[in-house]
Amino acid sequence: MSKNKVSASSGRWLKEHFDDKYVLEAQKRGYRSRAIFKIEEIQNKDKLLKSGMTVVDLGAAPGGWSQYAVEQVGDEGQVIACDILPMDSIAGVSFLQGDFREEAVLDALLERIQPDMVDVVMSDMAPNMSGNLAVDQPRAMYLVELALDMCRQVLAPNGSFTVKVFQGEGFDQYLQEVRNMFKVVKIRKPDSSRARSREVYIVATGYKG
């Protein structure tokens, strides 16, 4: 691809980003990313987060979901966040930087969570996209499998799970896997999710344990 094409594409993305009403509203309300409106819409419909809950936020940076979760769980609750990228501190959030695919990072994350179980696992993780669907989709599915495995390790009975998933190869099998583990499973496409994106959010409640 030529440099001019890349520049034109980048320019369109930047214009779309800065004209985006969700970007503008996030800035106005003091949130770190437009992604906050995705979890807010899920919360308004499904009421996953309640005062006093313990929440794990995977793929947390830059911190929009963690910011929102802290507001919902309050001073009696706890938010434990993890990301391979750095994240500026948020009051009430215990943040661990690292790749939890690595055993040492996973152990450190589990140490922060245990001995208590958690009420909600949420994941907005996505791989760095190459533009090659044959490469990107397996990477994305690998991450959502890791998030589901985290549920198996730390989620309390009747706990909840929400995860960003890209529709494509492996999606139907993954959805069935989630349905086997939870009593109620819904698929959400938040208004703030760009229409052209293949992303949807699986919202699962009533973990069978």
UniProtKB/Swiss-Prot annotation:
It catalyses: uridine(2552) in 23S rRNA + S-adenosyl-L-methionine = 2'-O-methyluridine(2552) in 23S rRNA + S-adenosyl-L-homocysteine + H(+). InterPro entries: RNA_methyltr_RlmE (IPR050082), RNA_MeTrfase_FtsJ_dom (IPR002877), rRNA-MeTfrase_E (IPR015507), SAM-dependent_MTases_sf (IPR029063). S-adenosyl-L-methionine binds at residues 63, 65, 83, 99, 124. GO terms for cellular component: cytoplasm. It is found in: Cytoplasm. It comes from the Bacteria. Keywords: Cytoplasm, Methyltransferase, rRNA processing, S-adenosyl-L-methionine, Transferase. GO terms for molecular function: rRNA (uridine-2'-O-)-methyltransferase activity. The active site is at 164 (proton acceptor). Its EC number is 2.1.1.166. Coiled coil: none annotated. It holds the Pfam family FtsJ. Its main location: cytoplasm. It is an enzyme of class 2 (transferase). Belongs to the class I-like SAM-binding methyltransferase superfamily. RNA methyltransferase RlmE family. NCBIfam families: PRK11188.1. Specifically methylates the uridine in position 2552 of 23S rRNA at the 2'-O position of the ribose in the fully assembled 50S ribosomal subunit. This is Ribosomal RNA large subunit methyltransferase E. The lineage of its organism: Bacteria, Pseudomonadati, Pseudomonadota, Gammaproteobacteria, Vibrionales. The gene is rlmE.
